[in-house]
């Protein structure tokens, strides 16, 4: 087998044999290096519902929008003008590879000519929601409470949060009290999206 390989390789120019060798090495490296898709568990869809009693940053109102960050990912909603009780009802979808990471939500006031004003932030973990997903529940009556998360120093929940089985899927409604600001809350909902070949 070795003799045969050497014989056939001698039929090709040296430069072509080098190209094949380099291509083979690159292919080997690509197989050995884990990609983002390999570590991906699924997608977290965060529906930013609305803001309640947000801080005033302009003359009599604010132009708020929400920025959501997790690890190196950053997404934002549209701006709603002149409203301290805005309704976004907008979905922001993050890829999740580590369920221990927290999500940072920050509200800003949009300004045309100056730097956008910060209107508070809140942080929350997704571990309780992920743990409920790992139960692999099926065929529960819609509205069944699977688990609850209490407000504590470790989260920014304004009230008890429930993970609920709703229309064939798990969702978690959360009300976040904003920090580093005089007032304001943001209501959101978490939902998990499975990917083909992936899972918890």
Curated annotation (Swiss-Prot):
Record-listed Ca(2+) 1 binding positions: 57-58, 109, 111, 117
Record's subcellular location: Cell membrane; Nucleus
Record key words, sorted: Abscisic acid signaling pathway, Calcium, Cell membrane, GTPase activation, Lipid-binding, Membrane, Metal-binding, Nucleus
A UniProt-annotated Pfam family: C2
Gene Ontology CC annotations of this record: nucleus; plasma membrane
One annotated GO molecular function: metal ion binding
Chain positions recorded as Ca(2+) 2 binding sites: 58, 63, 109-111
Disrupted-gene phenotype: When associated with disruption in CAR1, CAR4 and CAR9 genes, reduced sensitivity to abscisic acid (ABA) during seedling establishment and root growth regulation.
C2 domain mapped to chain residues: 22-142
Domain of life: Eukaryota
A biological process term (GO) from this entry: positive regulation of GTPase activity
Keyword Translocase tagged: no
PANTHER family in the record: PROTEIN C2-DOMAIN ABA-RELATED 4, PROTEIN C2-DOMAIN ABA-RELATED 5
Function: Stimulates the GTPase/ATPase activities of Obg-like ATPases. Mediates the transient calcium-dependent interaction of PYR/PYL/RCAR abscisic acid (ABA) receptors with the plasma membrane and thus regulates ABA sensitivity.
Subunit: Binds to PYR/PYL/RCAR abscisic acid intracellular receptors in an ABA-independent manner, both at the plasma membrane and in the nucleus.
Protein family membership: Belongs to the plant CAR protein family.
Name the record gives this protein: Protein C2-DOMAIN ABA-RELATED 5
Lineage start: Eukaryota, Viridiplantae, Streptophyta, Embryophyta, Tracheophyta
């Amino acid at each position: 087998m070795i003799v045969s390989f050497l014989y056939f390789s001698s039929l090709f120019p040296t430069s072509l044999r080098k190209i094949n060798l380099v291509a083979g090495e690159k292919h080997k490296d690509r197989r050995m290096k884990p990609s983002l898709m390999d570590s991906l568990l699924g997608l977290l869809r965060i529906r930013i519902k609305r803001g309640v009693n947000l801080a005033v940053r302009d003359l009599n109102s604010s132009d708020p929008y929400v920025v959501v960050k997790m690890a190196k990912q950053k997404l934002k909603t549209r701006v709603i003008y002149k409203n301290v009780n805005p309704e976004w009802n907008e979905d922001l979808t993050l890829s999740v590879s580590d369920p221990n990471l927290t999500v940072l939500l920050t509200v800003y006031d949009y300004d045309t000519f100056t730097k956008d004003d910060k209107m508070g932030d809140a942080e929350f973990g997704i571990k309780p929601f992920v743990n409920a997903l790992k139960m692999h529940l099926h065929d529960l009556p819609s509205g069944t409470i699977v688990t609850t998360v209490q407000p504590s120093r470790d989260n920014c929940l304004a009230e008890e949060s429930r993970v609920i089985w709703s229309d064939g899927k798990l969702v978690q409604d959360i009300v976040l009290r904003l920090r580093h600001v005089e007032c304001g809350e943001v209501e959101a909902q978490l939902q998990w999206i499975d990917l083909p070949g992936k899972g918890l």
